[in-house]
Design a protein with these regions (language model features):
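Short Lys/Arg-rich amphipathic alpha-helical segments
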Residues: 1-155
Length: 155
């Protein structure tokens, strides 16, 4: 991951079972995807996800390869998890848009508008855009498009 930019997407929680799973508090955007076999940066280590699954209504569990005991995963507890921008095109929402976190503080297409942030509310993602801060913009294909690795605000 050395040539790619890393983005914080989660924080690891306590161990869940004897089989190496632990809770992960991950950004809502990623909760519905199968993250198995991708690499993630955990603290200073690059780890491969062996299994990622939903637990109960709004919780997720993760298991990293070669982490099979409570002792081994306990040392990962409370560590920040980051994902590389090399996965930008691999995880797209129903509107074919990537995770908006990849575009924070970047221009939206060729405009002077900049994505300042985003938040998740009741199954919807809303974006805050410079010069339009009074109106959160829904993150969907009616307002945004994704072309040539650029996020574009549709006028």
């Amino acid at each position: 991951m050395t040539n790619n930019t890393l983005y914080q997407v989660a924080k690891l929680g306590k161990p869940h079972s004897l089989r190496g799973f632990q809770y992960i508090n991950i950004d809502n955007f990623f909760r519905r995807f199968d993250l198995s076999n991708i690499s993630m940066q955990v603290g200073n280590e690059e780890l491969i996800v062996e299994n990622f699954k939903t637990h109960l209504k709004d919780r997720n569990l993760i298991k990293f390869k070669d982490f099979d005991t409570i002792e081994s995963i306990e040392r990962l507890r409370d560590k920040v998890v980051s994902i590389s921008d090399k996965y930008k095109n691999d995880f797209l929402n129903d509107s074919k848009l990537p995770w908006p976190g990849f575009f924070i503080n970047k221009n939206l297409g060729k405009s002077d508008l900049v994505l300042l942030g985003f938040n998740f509310s009741q199954n919807f993602t809303f974006c805050e855009v410079s010069n339009l801060t009074d109106f959160p913009i829904p993150y969907n294909d009616k307002f945004f498009s994704y072309q040539n690795n650029q996020l574009i605000l549709i006028n």
